[in-house]
């Protein structure tokens, strides 16, 4: 497995003190993912990312995150879920291993577990969860509060 890019974005909470932020997105996710896409040469995330592991501490967080990652059009994430696009046989499988709500939320270790799942997938070792053709995986992790947090994005692929 090869790390194609890794980005961090930190928020000091200033966006929550202005009326310009309505709480429907996470600025750090948008910043970190766009930087990662740019550096990894990804122009069409929805078509190029083939699997994701995201910080799904709450159901709404996963939905908002998929929009912030440009894997769903803003305001249309629920349609993508209902259409099955994030299912294991969908266009962009998400949380193939069940995510945080399945594994629990080991604070400090959540990101490592996500990367491990992408490692298993890219090396064909995920057993019954194995995707047919994983090419690029995206890992998204958060820490903090919606208005004041740090976001980590990793894009991984096979070692060429």
What do these predicted regions represent?
Residues 12-16, 57-62, 111-112, 116:
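Acyl-CoA/ACP chain-elongation machinery
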Residues 8-13, 50-59, 99-100:
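A short beta-alpha structural unit
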Residues 71-84, 126-132:
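A glycine-biased, small/acidic residue-tolerant capping/turn segment at secondary-structure junctions
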Residues 106-126:
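Active-site-proximal alpha-helical scaffold in enzymes
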Residues 32-48, 126:
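Phosphate/pyrophosphate-binding loops at sites that engage ATP/ADP/AMP, CoA/4′-phosphopantetheine
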Residues 4-35, 83-97, 130-136, 141, ...:
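Condensing-enzyme catalytic core mediating Claisen C-C bond formation in acyl metabolism
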Residues 17-22, 55-78, 106, 145-153:
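Short glycine/threonine-rich loop-to-helix capping motif typified by GTGT followed
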């Amino acid at each position: 497995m090869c790390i194609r890019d890794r980005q961090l974005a930190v928020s000091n909470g200033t966006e929550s003190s202005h009326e310009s932020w309505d709480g429907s997105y996470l600025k750090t996710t948008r910043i970190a993912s766009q930087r990662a896409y740019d550096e990894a040469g990804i122009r069409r995330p929805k078509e190029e990312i083939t699997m994701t592991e995201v910080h799904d501490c709450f159901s709404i967080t996963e939905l908002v995150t998929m929009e912030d990652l440009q894997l769903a059009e803003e305001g249309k994430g629920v349609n993508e879920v209902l259409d099955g696009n994030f299912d294991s046989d969908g266009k962009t499988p998400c949380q193939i291993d069940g995510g945080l709500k399945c594994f629990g939320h080991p604070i400090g270790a959540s990101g490592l577990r996500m990367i491990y799942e992408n490692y298993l997938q890219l090396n064909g070792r995920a057993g019954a969860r194995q995707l047919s053709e994983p090419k690029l995986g995206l890992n998204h992790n958060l820490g903090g509060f919606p208005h004041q947090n740090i976001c980590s994005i990793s894009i991984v692929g096979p070692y060429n």
